[in-house]
Amino acid sequence: MNRDEYWNPILETLPLEQLQRLQLKKFKEIFTWAYEHSKFYRKLYGDAGMEPGDIKSFEDIRKVPKIEKSMMRDIQGKDPFPYGDILCVPLEEVTDYRQTSGTTGQPIYQADTWQDWEFSTEAYAYALYAQGYRPGDRCFLPFGYNIFIAFWAYHYAGEKIGCEMIPGGVLNTEARILKMQELRATAMGATPTYVLGMAETARKIGINPPTDLQIRKITVAGEPGGSIPATKKRMEEAWGAKVYDQVGSTEIGHWGWECRQQAGLHVNEAFFLVEIIDVDTGKHIDKPGKQGKMVVTTFNRSAQPCIRFDVKDLIQWNAQQCDCGRTFRLLDGGIRGRADDITKVKGVLLSPTAIEEVVRDIPQLSNEYQVMVIKKGDIDDITLKVEIVPEYAKDEASIRTVLVDQLRLKTNLGYNIEFHEFGSLPRSQAKSRRFLDQRPKLH
């Protein structure tokens, strides 16, 4: 075993039986902590007839009530303000505030103690070290430091490893690119959308990232593109760098990441318990190859614990063990979408990630696209807006044919295809909402 490959060689290579014992022990501890310190959790578990002494096995864990975003929204704004009675520590122990982006509704407030934030940084350090970050790396963060968790932990994890961290802050995209060139930055963290957008901007100002910049490692998060092969390929070719996916959320923390093998997402099973639940039956999925929604427990967050949080991201286990030697299990294909993003169009279940895979696999199209679903009478009508790269403008007819055929093959649907002028569709630095469902809501 090459110990230099692991941030924590002991935990990352722990035999399965020992790892499961550790998870059961940590679940009991966080369950007990929440039961004894949070009115919200005490009532939730009391109503279910459960108390700490009942947790003796993984089967017992599966009986513990799940929590959802809607439950957290309901208690926000109440005492202790603004977090509500999910809080497990006195307000004076809260040192950090973050909130979700609100893309699925009212933002969720997240409280952390200093120790909680140290845990978040440690969890991210596992990811960056696995991706080859080392002392001597000069890491650029082209992100606005704000109330969203975004790449805050990337910054502090990089420092913890010994990297030099350069905050891009309020600089615009062009200035960020020039600063990366000036300082010879070797690594970067951003959303997939912004990674592609920065490469586009760089070319406009005469900079070719693979040859004119020294970025050789890119960590992406915030969107599913890092585990979509066509999108990853575009990013790697645009920058001449390895691109690694990293996943997490404000409420949970940074629970999964790719290592240098790029064989799938490792789940940090020393810090988190990840369960996969069948969307239709509610039963557990333990075997590889079957997709379900993710339920996560964070072991090391004391202020506002997340215990059996129904994330609704769709994942499935990979049957293979990674060649890196870690015993943390792999997910096959990363985040495959969200259970609440999958929508029925013309009677067909449609995942937005399937459309992204098709668009990004056609090199004559730009990185940007937009999908719009409306009602025409009683019929669903779906339009895909794309941009052709200028040098291929004369090939619009053949590109349309390929696009229509691939969309039909991958999604079983027909689309109205609209070609727009290159650069005219919206660009974003953060999470992009490219799927717009404008059909009337049924009540």
Labelled PLM ranges:
Residues V195-Q214, K233-E236:
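Adenylate-forming
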Residues Y133-D137:
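Short helix-loop-beta connector
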Residues V220, G225-S227, T231-Q321:
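Conserved AMP-binding/adenylate-forming
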Residues M188, V295, F299-L413, A430:
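AMP-binding/adenylate-forming catalytic core of the ANL superfamily
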